[in-house]
Amino acid sequence: MNELIFMVEEAPEGGFVARALGESIFTEADTIAELSGKVRDAVRCHFEEGKAPKIVRLHHVREEVITV
């Protein structure tokens, strides 16, 4: 695996959550900057030495409701 994508969303209670697509990896943090470090740690813990993807992408999803 060369690349892993995380979907990042704002948590209802505040902060952010990140879920890996195709892997059972989940983490959360209060800030985006903190989340990046936690994603790195979670990926390192999930994969065996030398098996982790080379690239991790954080795909930020933000839902906004507007009236028309």
List where the protein language model places each region.
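Short aromatic-glycine-(Arg/Gly/Cys) micro-motifs in beta-strand/loop hairpins
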Residues: 8-20
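A short, exposed loop/beta-hairpin motif centered on an aromatic-Gly-Thr core
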Residues: 23-33
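Short, charged, surface-exposed hinge/linker loops at domain edges
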Residues: 1-5, 33, 37-68
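Short aromatic/hydrophobic contact patches that present stacked aromatics
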Residues: 5, 17, 26
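Short acidic, gly/pro-rich beta-turn/loop elements at beta-sheet edges
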Residues: 16, 28, 37
